[in-house]
A protein has these predicted regions:
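Residues within mature, well-folded domains
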Residues: 1-165
């Protein structure tokens, strides 16, 4: 169903209400309408959120559905990464942050900075597509801000400076 992937942005109470509702589709629609206040905006948010979920299921499924994996979680919340590095041990995903303006003498320079998520490949009898997020390696992830933006009916974008306030 479409309700379980909302676990990243819905409260436990909201999840319980939607999952136990006699009319789950109506409960799901109301969840999105409460976020946006507009049918058109809700449709757009639903399209983006569930396209990311579909992509996660297609590319990141291991012994569990892709949206339940660490890579799926990050992809759903942050979208496609700006940079990806892969090796035998794992993957690193980089999301571009707003450029930092620094002054050197009379010149200003802009430096690109990235938020990195590092995934370590797990050995598994059941799948060769199982990766675990190194949570200690990402001290600032803006997770709470990302959740808040989705709950406000907005798609979170890390490269937008207004998003980080």
């Amino acid at each position: 169903t479409m309700i379980p992937p909302l676990a990243y942005i819905a409260t436990p109470q909201e999840m319980d209400e939607m999952l136990t509702s006699e009319k789950p589709k109506l409960a799901l629609d109301n969840f999105w309408l409460e976020r946006t206040g507009s049918i058109e905006r809700s449709k757009e948010l639903i399209r983006i959120y569930y396209n990311r979920t579909l992509f996660s299921n297609y590319y990141f499924t291991s012994y569990k559905a892709g949206w339940l994996t660490d890579r799926g979680m990050v992809y759903i919340m942050y979208g496609p990464p700006d940079k990806v590095y892969k090796n035998a041990e794992g993957e690193s995903w980089g999301y571009k942050r707003p450029p930092v303006k620094s002054r050197w003498g009379s010149r200003y320079t802009y430096e690109d900075q990235y938020l990195w998520f590092n995934f370590r490949k797990q050995k598994s009898l059941f799948s060769d597509n199982d990766f675990v997020l190194n949570r200690a390696g990402t001290p600032v992830s803006y997770w709470d801000i990302a959740v808040a933006r989705w709950r406000e009916g907005k798609v979170f974008r890390l490269d937008n400076p207004q998003e980080l306030r």
